Amino acid sequence: MKTDFNQKIEQLKEFIEECRRVWLVLKKPTKDEYLAVAKVTALGISLLGIIGYIIHVPATYIKGILKPPTTPRV
Protein backbone atom coordinates (compact mmCIF):
# COMPACT_ATOMS: atom_id res chain seq x y z
CA MET A 1 0.00 0.00 0.00
CA LYS A 2 2.83 2.36 0.87
CA THR A 3 4.55 1.66 -2.47
CA ASP A 4 1.34 2.44 -4.38
CA PHE A 5 1.17 5.82 -2.67
CA ASN A 6 4.85 6.51 -3.37
CA GLN A 7 4.37 5.43 -6.98
CA LYS A 8 1.44 7.83 -7.39
CA ILE A 9 3.49 10.65 -5.85
CA GLU A 10 6.34 9.93 -8.29
CA GLN A 11 3.94 9.94 -11.24
CA LEU A 12 2.54 13.27 -10.07
CA LYS A 13 6.04 14.74 -9.73
CA GLU A 14 6.96 13.55 -13.24
CA PHE A 15 3.76 15.03 -14.65
CA ILE A 16 4.39 18.38 -12.96
CA GLU A 17 7.97 18.40 -14.28
CA GLU A 18 6.74 17.70 -17.83
CA CYS A 19 4.16 20.49 -17.51
CA ARG A 20 6.88 22.86 -16.32
CA ARG A 21 9.05 22.02 -19.34
CA VAL A 22 6.17 22.67 -21.73
CA TRP A 23 5.31 25.93 -19.95
CA LEU A 24 8.90 27.17 -20.38
CA VAL A 25 8.79 26.50 -24.15
CA LEU A 26 5.42 28.21 -24.71
CA LYS A 27 5.28 31.66 -26.23
CA LYS A 28 2.46 34.05 -26.95
CA PRO A 29 1.60 34.12 -30.66
CA THR A 30 2.31 37.30 -32.58
CA LYS A 31 -0.53 39.25 -34.15
CA ASP A 32 0.35 37.84 -37.59
CA GLU A 33 0.35 34.26 -36.29
CA TYR A 34 -2.97 34.81 -34.54
CA LEU A 35 -4.56 36.28 -37.68
CA ALA A 36 -3.24 33.42 -39.81
CA VAL A 37 -4.77 30.84 -37.45
CA ALA A 38 -8.05 32.80 -37.36
CA LYS A 39 -8.19 32.93 -41.18
CA VAL A 40 -7.51 29.21 -41.55
CA THR A 41 -10.13 28.40 -38.91
CA ALA A 42 -12.73 30.63 -40.59
CA LEU A 43 -11.93 29.06 -43.96
CA GLY A 44 -12.33 25.55 -42.51
CA ILE A 45 -15.65 26.36 -40.84
CA SER A 46 -16.94 27.98 -44.05
CA LEU A 47 -15.86 24.99 -46.12
CA LEU A 48 -17.66 22.60 -43.77
CA GLY A 49 -20.79 24.76 -43.95
CA ILE A 50 -20.72 24.80 -47.75
CA ILE A 51 -20.25 21.04 -47.91
CA GLY A 52 -23.12 20.56 -45.47
CA TYR A 53 -25.37 22.80 -47.53
CA ILE A 54 -24.42 21.01 -50.75
CA ILE A 55 -25.40 17.70 -49.12
CA HIS A 56 -28.55 19.11 -47.49
CA VAL A 57 -30.18 20.57 -50.62
CA PRO A 58 -30.28 17.38 -52.75
CA ALA A 59 -31.18 15.28 -49.70
CA THR A 60 -34.18 17.53 -48.99
CA TYR A 61 -35.21 17.45 -52.66
CA ILE A 62 -34.95 13.65 -52.83
CA LYS A 63 -36.86 13.32 -49.56
CA GLY A 64 -39.68 15.43 -51.05
CA ILE A 65 -39.83 13.25 -54.17
CA LEU A 66 -39.85 9.95 -52.31
CA LYS A 67 -42.36 10.98 -49.65
CA PRO A 68 -45.20 13.15 -50.93
CA PRO A 69 -46.50 15.75 -48.49
CA THR A 70 -49.44 14.70 -46.35
CA THR A 71 -52.67 16.65 -46.39
CA PRO A 72 -53.54 18.33 -43.10
CA ARG A 73 -56.49 16.92 -41.15
CA VAL A 74 -59.44 19.17 -40.53
Curated annotation (Swiss-Prot):
Entry membrane topology: Single-pass membrane protein
Transmembrane feature ranges: 37-62
Stretches assigned to the Extracellular side: 63-74
Location within or outside the cell: Cell membrane
Keyword annotations: Cell membrane, Membrane, Protein transport, Translocation, Transmembrane, Transmembrane helix, Transport
Pfam families in UniProt: SecE
Protein transport among keywords: yes
Alphabetized Gene3D superfamilies for the sequence: Preprotein translocase SecE subunit
Family matches, as InterPro entries: Prot_translocase_SecE_dom_sf, Translocase_Sec61-g, Translocase_SecE/Sec61-g
GO cellular component, one term: plasma membrane
GO BP of this protein: intracellular protein transmembrane transport; protein secretion; protein targeting
All ranges on the Cytoplasmic side of the membrane: 1-36
Molecular function as annotated in GO: protein transmembrane transporter activity
Role description: Essential subunit of the protein translocation channel SecYEG. Clamps together the 2 halves of SecY. May contact the channel plug during translocation.
Family: Belongs to the SecE/SEC61-gamma family.
Subunit relationships: Component of the Sec protein translocase complex. Heterotrimer consisting of alpha (SecY), beta (SecG) and gamma (SecE) subunits. The heterotrimers can form oligomers, although 1 heterotrimer is thought to be able to translocate proteins. Interacts with the ribosome. May interact with SecDF, and other proteins may be involved.
Official protein name in the record: Protein translocase subunit SecE
Species of provenance: Methanocaldococcus jannaschii (strain ATCC 43067 / DSM 2661 / JAL-1 / JCM 10045 / NBRC 100440)
Chain's gene name: secE
